[in-house]
């Protein structure tokens, strides 16, 4: 979306995705002022798709996914890695409104197991609206490397009238800030709160925050959960560190097939395999038995009214609903009347999200 950011003719933009069948109506209400946007980005919008480290190895294997960025997935990468911040055009948690808000952190405290914050939110604009308060933490960089910012909690206000104020309380467990030690740098296979200073940042996006009025100090490492190693990665040779360098990882192998969770299968034998052909005609061999064909409408030999008049109620249902999904592709098609020469036209579901394949035959939907 760098073209939106860089085009001086565009003063504002409204993004609507995953809206489903009511998404268009909701967008109309927002554009006409009947409603007020209050959504926040759940992703980081970088200037170019190549700015995301996952682009280089997206869908390179059907057997495993190599998260090159390791724990620095999404906004954690862009907020931590040197030089990555400049690539962001719309940060995680970002979202505007027709009105404005003021946030004031009035109190922060901790118990033995949790951290609490109270934030006063005031609508300082001219329109009724809602705001999302977000709290992030910065954990100390010790033996276990960590992202510069991590979302800890968030909450949305009620609909606030101009000048109205609401007190929001945010809380999260201290154990949520623990890091997993898989290599035994401190305690193998354990979740650990490393000693040091834990800082908190409160605001309306990962970038639009102010440091909290209180920090948390730990003088000793705290093990929050002790586990044992199972399903250790066998294909991960290295992983990214917070400075952009990589550390090599020890290699493990499945020494006994009975210890493996999955055994290798011949191609095509996996249960639930997506069909190679997504939409097939209901009749491979047929005679039209005097049925009027859709090609005659397309070529002007038959009116559309005459063509539709011959269809039964079942035919009309097939024409409207298309071919049912028989695999796991989660797409639908209109048409599916091969007896009348009407093919299936594949469409994406209304709230279809991002594709999980390297290539796709049907784009997803957004306004």
Regions found by a protein language model. Give the residues of each.
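N-terminal amphipathic, basic-rich helices that act as targeting or association modules
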Residues: 288-341
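Short, intrinsically disordered, charge-balanced linker/junction segments flanking boundaries
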Residues: 362-367
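Short acidic, flexible loop segments centered on an aromatic residue
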Residues: 126-143, 149
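Secreted, periplasmic, or luminal enzymes acting at the cell surface/secretory milieu
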Residues: 2-130, 162, 190-205, 209, ...
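Intrinsically disordered, low-complexity Pro/Gly/Ser/Thr-rich segments with frequent PxxP/GP/PP motifs
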Residues: 143-186
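Acidic, glycine-rich active-site loops and adjacent beta-strand->loop/helix elements
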Residues: 1, 47-49, 139-141, 174
